[in-house]
């Protein structure tokens, strides 16, 4: 399950300093904050497993003329949480086939109370992180001058207040549960497929 939020923070004295060979967005120009729910000092957790928050500041390559406040840096935080395996969530093959005759996957999946509780915690952690950095959480059209921008951004699923549907951020939805036998799992405790010898 994932939550995406944009924000602005005051620029630092080095914010506009040119960077030689700037890193790609998904590389060294971003950061990752892990959050484990099994830490002993955490007492307000009502979900299992954990999540991490991926983010960056001033790495989106937004031209200055599009920025509403030139004295602020624009950043994003995207929290990705672990989804519990449940028998109800499944992938099966449809009787329908694609243009090459291959059966189309049929995915049955929904968030459980665990993931929805985690999403609320992720949202709260993102808010606290932005506040700790003296920043403000804002919608993307509050940060940038995009002609007719709100017409495009108001319906973007990733920018909505609630978590996007399962599979929107593809890496949060697993499909091969680990278990003790082939009847209830795809892989064994060593992550080996039951059906491969």
Task: Enumerate the predicted regions with their spans.
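Hydrophobic (often cysteine-bearing) scaffold residues that line and stabilize catalytic clefts
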Residues: 118-122
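Non-transmembrane alpha-helical segments in soluble domains
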Residues: 123-131
């Amino acid at each position: 399950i994932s939550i995406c939020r944009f924000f602005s923070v005051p620029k630092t004295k080095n914010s506009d300093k040119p960077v030689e060979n700037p890193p790609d967005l998904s590389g060294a120009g971003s950061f990752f904050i892990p959050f484990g729910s099994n830490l002993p000092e955490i007492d307000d957790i009502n979900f299992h497993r954990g999540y991490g928050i991926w983010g960056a500041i001033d790495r989106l390559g937004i031209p200055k003329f599009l920025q509403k406040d030139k004295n602020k840096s624009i950043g994003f935080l995207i929290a990705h949480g672990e989804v519990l395996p449940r028998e109800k969530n499944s992938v099966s093959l449809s009787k329908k086939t694609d243009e090459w005759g291959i059966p189309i996957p049929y995915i049955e999946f929904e968030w459980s109370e665990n993931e929805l509780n985690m999403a609320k915690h992720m949202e709260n952690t993102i808010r606290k992180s932005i506040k700790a950095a003296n920043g403000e959480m804002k919608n993307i059209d509050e940060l940038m001058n995009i002609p007719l921008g709100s017409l495009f951004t108001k319906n973007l699923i990733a920018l909505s207040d609630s978590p996007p549907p399962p599979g929107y951020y593809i890496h949060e939805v697993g499909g091969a549960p680990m278990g003790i036998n082939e009847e209830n799992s795809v892989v064994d405790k060593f992550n080996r497929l039951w059906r491969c010898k």
